[in-house]
Amino acid sequence: NKELLTAAGYTQDDIKGFDDLKKVADDIQARKAELGVDGAFTSAGMDGSSDWRFKTHLANLPIYYEYKADGIGSTDAIKGTYLDNYKKIWDLYITDSTCDPKLLASKTGNDAVAEFVGKKAVFYQNGTWAYNDVKDLGDDNLGMLPIYIGVNGEENQGLCTGSENFWCVNYNSSDADIQATLDFLYWCVTSEAGTSAMADKMGFVIPFKKAKDSTNPLIAIANDYVAEGKTS
């Protein structure tokens, strides 16, 4: 939330790595009553609607840096070199938070969204696909930062980028239903109506030649990082 970050006396340009992030978050947490927030970060809920943000998406960072440093491409080769970095960012999330860490087991993804949209937290970890959840803040108030974990060179890091690899079609269905489903999926990613719905109403990136560009401003921010030469 750029509005809250500015009210605290900072801009995104002040945050170029983990140490900067911690300094800013610690200060916001210490002044939360003055700033009218409940914490620097939204609650890092560990129920099924939220824990994937940290057990998979956040965990990708230390794994990526180990793959890069050791030239590996298999999870069997992971030694846990950057586990301390993983712990550092996680500890920051739950210490400079809107809630006591003891409550995280029951906190949900909707809780985090409500805290962010309700201007009770400055930072919220999620991706471009969550735009519809947070758009009520106003596009001008939405910014995106890389997830910093305290690794050398992370000032040149962009946003984490990933995608789902496939859609599933139930092969136990009738041949007619399978074909109808495949036809529908093709329509979704090639037709004007289908790509408009996915780009404008859902805010998705659609990586197909005939697809419409998304109007999601978070995707534009992600593209800006790439244009600046940041690793994404």
Language-model features and meaning:
Residues E3-D14, T98-D100:
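Aromatic-glycine-rich donor-binding/catalytic loop that engages nucleotide-sugar donors
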Residues G109, N126-Y131, I147, S163-N165:
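Beta->alpha turn/N-cap motifs
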Residues V122-G127, G143:
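Paired acidic/hydrophobic, glycine-rich loop segments that form the ligand-binding mouth/hinge
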Residues K22-T75, A121:
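Extracytoplasmic/periplasmic solute-binding protein
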Residues A8, D136-K201:
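Extracytoplasmic/periplasmic substrate-recognition and gating elements
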Residues K16-K22, L103-G118:
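Short helix-initiation/N-cap motifs at beta->coil->alpha
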Residues V24-D27, G71-S106:
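Glycine-centered hinge/linker elements that transmit conformational signals in sensory
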Residues M198-S232:
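Long, aromatic- and glycine/proline-rich binding clefts that accommodate carbohydrate-like moieties
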